[in-house]
């Protein structure tokens, strides 16, 4: 997709913020351009990381997430404030790269599973049919074998059509490997895997009695393991994470040290920034799937920078984010457009939810404008949380309908401006109340 097409796609989900959309679209297109070059030149070209500056709820995370989802890219969102300097108790910054690799491997595995779904289903059907019709003894006659094949084919069709779903069978189920901690150091991960192997040697499978319907679900793990090539999935997952991965680091401002308040800052904040440097610049990180170079991962950092400034980050880290975009706060018109012009808007979501209760919900244009106006006022009078304020205001307006569904079933309800004002009157007028409820 061209940068214009990417921005057009993002426009259907995010209102405004054109500068941020352009920066992300160009960064994404540059990856495609890089892949068209010779290998030697490719190695010299690294992504230009982006720093987004803007208050909460203006679309920073959504831009990156929508972009990654649209292109099928490995993507993780992390909070910088959750990490600690090496030597302190907590997660080290390398764990974000391990999270990315895990997300990438899962993405590739899902793609392979979808492509091999027919084979997986065949494996499951075959296993269940064999349990329902045990194989003939080795010395059976040709006539018996032919008769068995006909019966087997008929039974297989019954399993496929679900005609025998309620029959009880005893099957051998492969035990799932225990879930380990991917954020341990590489040496400890190897020790952990060795322990799991020893624990699994004694009993690879367990016998369980269940219905055919339940067996179809229970055999899914075994069928997937049997059909899919785990090694190729691992290699492809590593490659994609390395070449196409996107790491979104939120709350980067929380690890910046303000000059005004440096005496009271957490001493580990600068340590986290210094630990981030080699990851963002390019280094090799060990994961349980293998080593990954971080040179070509696109890092997008974001923060509100209310207390600190981007210049409060250590100079070396500032240099690793050469592209800076400032996202504007959302005004009343922007909030109105979010409610009316975005795909899967909040209003549409509530309409679909209440349709399941046989309630038809409509919003007048005046009501939508009133929702936008009151949400904007609440943002100005208390903390500005951007579009997230709409969730709270709409929830308050629809609270009575959502709770008393039995009274409204089979009816068509139009929400007008007066209903919106009545529902939010006390909260909007009382600043202290709005601060805690809105």
Residue ranges and their predicted role:
Residues 1-438:
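Non-catalytic accessory segments flanking P-loop/AAA+ NTPase cores
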């Amino acid at each position: 997709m061209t940068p214009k097409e990417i921005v057009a796609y993002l426009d259907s989900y995010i209102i405004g913020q054109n500068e941020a959309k352009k920066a992300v679209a160009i960064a994404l297109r540059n990856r495609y351009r890089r892949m068209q070059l010779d290998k030697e030149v490719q190695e010299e070209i690294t992504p230009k990381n982006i720093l987004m500056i803007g208050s909460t709820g203006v679309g920073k995370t959504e831009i990156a997430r929508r972009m990654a989802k649209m292109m099928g890219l490995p993507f993780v969102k992390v909070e910088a404030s959750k990490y600690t300097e090496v030597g302190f108790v907590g997660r080290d910054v390398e764990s974000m790269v391990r999270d990315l690799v895990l997300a990438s491997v899962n993405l590739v595995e899902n793609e392979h599973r979808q492509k091999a779904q027919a084979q997986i289903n065949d494996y499951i059907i075959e296993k269940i049919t064999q349990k329902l019709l045990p194989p003939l003894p080795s010395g059976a006659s040709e006539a018996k074998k032919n008769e068995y094949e006909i019966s087997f084919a008929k039974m297989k069709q019954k399993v496929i059509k679900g005609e025998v779903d309620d029959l009880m069978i005893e099957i051998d189920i492969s035990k799932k490997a225990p879930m380990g901690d991917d954020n341990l150091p590489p040496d400890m991960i190897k020790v952990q895997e060795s322990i799991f192997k020893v624990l699994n040697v004694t009993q690879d499978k367990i016998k369980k009695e269940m219905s055919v319907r339940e067996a179809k679900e229970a055999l899914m793990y075994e069928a997937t393991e049997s059909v899919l090539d785990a090694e190729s999935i691992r290699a492809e997952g590593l490659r994609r994470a390395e070449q196409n991965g996107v790491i979104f680091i939120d709350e980067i401002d929380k690890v910046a040290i303000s000059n005004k308040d440096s005496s009271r800052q957490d001493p580990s904040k600068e340590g986290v920034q210094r630990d981030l440097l080699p990851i963002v610049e390019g280094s090799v990180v060990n994961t349980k799937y293998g080593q990954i170079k971080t040179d070509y991962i696109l890092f997008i950092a974001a923060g509100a920078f209310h207390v600190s400034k981007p210049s409060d980050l250590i100079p070396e880290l500032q240099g690793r984010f050469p592209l800076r975009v400032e996202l504007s706060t959302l005004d009343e018109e922007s909030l109105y457009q979010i409610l009316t012009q975005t795909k899967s808007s909040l209003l549409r979501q509530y309409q679909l939810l209440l349709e399941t209760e046989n309630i038809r919900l409509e919003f007048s244009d005046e009501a939508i404008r009133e929702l936008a106006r009151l949400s904007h006022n609440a943002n100005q009078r208390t903390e500005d949380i951007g579009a997230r304020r709409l969730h709270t205001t709409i929830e308050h307006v629809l609270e009575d309908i959502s709770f008393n569904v039995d009274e409204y079933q089979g009816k068509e309800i139009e929400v007008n401006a007066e209903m919106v004002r009545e529902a939010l009157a006390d909260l909007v007028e009382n600043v202290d109340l709005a601060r805690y409820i809105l």
